[in-house]
Amino acid sequence: RYCLLSRGLGDVYKRQPENASIVLGISHSAWLTLDLPKPLPQELVEFEEIRGPKHTAVSTPGDLHFHIRATQPSVAYDMASAITAALRDIAEVLDEVHGFRYWDGRSIIGFVDGTENPQTPAAREYFGIIGDSDPMYRGGSYQFVQKYIHDMTAWNALPVSEQEKVIGRSKHDDIEMSEDEKPANSHSAIANIGDDFKVIRDNMPFGTVGNNELGTYFICYASTFSTVQKMLKNMFLGVDGANYDRLLDFSTAVTGTLFFVPTVDMLGDFAG
């Protein structure tokens, strides 16, 4: 069924090559249920919640995750429809989020998102793709997702200068504050865990204005899940005298699941 799904989505892509892509993630529980190859990817586990002094990175169930991207919404719709048709009799949808690009790549809270992403192809491959450390799964990736709901009323009540202290960057031109002026509990101070530990973020804003449910769908890819876990622990538990990431006072994580992303060749091998 994986092979049929891949071929079907490939046909959609060929008809409408609108920067379309789809990434399939498989969770630890699904890996065991589907009796996929052993040993498992080295860091594929069930994500355990991280309970901080005030906020919690929750753990929620999920077997498969499909990350669909396309310039044209109609292409994304066709791809989602193909997935649904292929899996309707064996799976149910637990969550479906429709993201969108907000201005010049900003989050819905108005700040540029993904500034710390590795920029060169070599760096993105190094930090985002599994290498020789796990030869059986070389070329795959760890995908971690969280759905954050923002308290936009509280956020918009802050003056821009205070919002900038929460993020640790300027809002208009995306310039990082100096170490002297950046608060220790700012998002950029806590979520950035060093040049040797990076992930590939592909976050998207989502939501509906009418009911004021607006948020960020956090998606990251990494060659090691331990890097993601370190970042999350910093954010929710605190580090270096800061008790937690202050952005969490305005953003609540309502989901949290870890997946492994196999290559297309791996999927073919899984199907036999």
What are these regions (language model features)?
Residues 2-13:
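Single conserved hydrophobic/aromatic residue that forms the stacking wall/gate
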Residues 67-116:
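Long, hydrophobic, well-ordered secondary-structure blocks that form the structural core
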Residues 101-204:
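Aromatic/basic-lined ligand-recognition segments
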Residues 233-272:
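TerminUS-proximal long segments
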